[in-house]
């Protein structure tokens, strides 16, 4: 028939030695006999005369099948091949006339990239027992895993935006970003780009056909659209897998360094680079942090000589053994103190000091303020009233309730000797 002749011509045109007529007859026989599935293994066995030549022929037959699927002579579902019917050919032709625009492909790629889940493992990293959430965006600022902390930047390049040679692209990128301390860039491997591009287009085309014929009453057409849905699902699985591979085997660029990634080293290599970034931008970070549960304890402790026992780290040696405040030269007191020259609300204080270069935790900020308040070094303004005494019960809730802390304001009270 015409289909058999077409298959023969198509394979001859691409220079394959597989006989198109014989190949389609083999598939037809397997489909009709129902003795074995028409998959690559059985088609190869049916095509050859001598079983010892199986491996000589298999890769060429696979290439021939791929070409015929691409040319819509065959349909591939669940690893089985079948010759397209006239109805299928007609619908496939109609489907092929549907054009998928580049901006749609770019958008769909981002959605499927999120579905790979590979960025979940690197979106938040713990360093010195403190979590840092990275702001992961594409190079066109599509969100993959966003964070309110824009200083922890992570750019993922779209496969569609790597122009020319990948090596040249990476060299240019290294030069452009060599002084950017606050951003890491991931460039995918582009070996499978053509296939990924084709899968994204095909999936969109199958979806278009599903929508167009969703209310179809003709059973023959309905059956073909059901087949299309199955093919689409398989294409989606294949796409997610290929996208994962492209990014897991990409290159990481940070301050002129290029780190080659693979599936096994991906998380470790990315985390190591993230720690470098954290170290580079949080230059005033402390070696340890405090828990916010300490703040109220400092205010209600009756024995001054017990105050120093609440703090084990030298970063927070606010009190001596007698309960005298001796923390003026501590880094944390100097840094927080520099923000307290005028009244500042708790919310702004936390927002500022949690960012680079400090990276202080909420617990560190609130407990340091509680210590300053205990030492008579702080004015707390709350509910339009100024408080100077730490023992005042009505102000203590500022240090036990996050919302109330954010609404309260704080200012240094400088202790100076009066004559």
Q: Where are each of the predicted segments found?
A:
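Extended alpha-helical interface modules used as scaffolds for assembling large macromolecular complexes
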Residues: 1-419
């Amino acid at each position: 028939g015409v289909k058999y002749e077409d298959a023969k011509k198509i394979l001859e045109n691409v220079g394959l030695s597989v006989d198109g007529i014989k190949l389609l007859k083999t598939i037809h026989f397997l489909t009709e006999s129902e003795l074995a599935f028409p998959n690559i293994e059985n088609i190869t066995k049916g095509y050859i005369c001598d079983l010892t030549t199986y491996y000589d022929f298999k890769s060429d037959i696979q290439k021939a099948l791929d070409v015929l699927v691409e040319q819509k002579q065959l349909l591939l579902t669940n690893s089985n091949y079948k010759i397209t019917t006239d109805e299928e050919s007609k619908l496939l032709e109609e489907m092929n006339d549907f054009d998928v625009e580049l901006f749609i492909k770019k958008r769909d790629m981002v959605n499927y990239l999120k579905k790979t889940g590979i960025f979940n493992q690197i979106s938040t990293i713990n360093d010195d027992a403190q979590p840092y959430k990275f702001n992961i965006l594409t190079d066109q600022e599509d969100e993959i895993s966003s964070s309110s902390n824009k200083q922890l930047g992570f750019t993922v390049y779209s496969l569609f935006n790597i122009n020319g040679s990948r090596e040249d692209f990476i060299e240019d990128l290294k030069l452009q970003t060599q002084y950017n301390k606050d951003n890491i860039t991931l460039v995918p491997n582009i070996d499978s780009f053509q296939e990924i591009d084709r899968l994204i287009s095909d999936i969109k085309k199958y979806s278009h056909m599903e929508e167009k014929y969703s209310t179809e009453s003709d059973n023959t057409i309905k059956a073909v659209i059901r087949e299309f849905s199955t093919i689409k699902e398989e294409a989606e699985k294949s796409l997610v897998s290929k996208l994962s591979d492209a990014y897991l085997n990409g290159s990481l660029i940070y301050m002129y360094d290029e780190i080659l990634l693979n599936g096994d080293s991906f998380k470790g290599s990315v985390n190591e680079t993230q720690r470098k970034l954290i170290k580079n931008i949080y230059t005033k970070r402390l070696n340890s942090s405090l828990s916010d549960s300490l703040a109220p304890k400092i205010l209600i402790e009756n024995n001054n000589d017990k105050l120093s026992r609440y703090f084990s780290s030298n970063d927070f040696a606010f009190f001596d053994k007698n309960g005298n405040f001796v923390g003026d030269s501590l880094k944390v007191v100097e840094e927080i103190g520099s923000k307290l020259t005028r009244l500042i609300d708790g919310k702004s204080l936390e927002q500022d000091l949690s960012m680079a270069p400090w990276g202080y935790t909420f617990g560190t900020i609130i407990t340091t303020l509680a210590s300053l308040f205990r030492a008579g070094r702080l004015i707390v303004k709350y509910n339009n009233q100024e408080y100077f005494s730490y023992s005042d019960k009505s102000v203590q809730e500022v240090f036990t309730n996050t919302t109330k802390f954010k609404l309260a304001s704080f200012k240094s009270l400088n202790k100076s000797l009066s004559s």
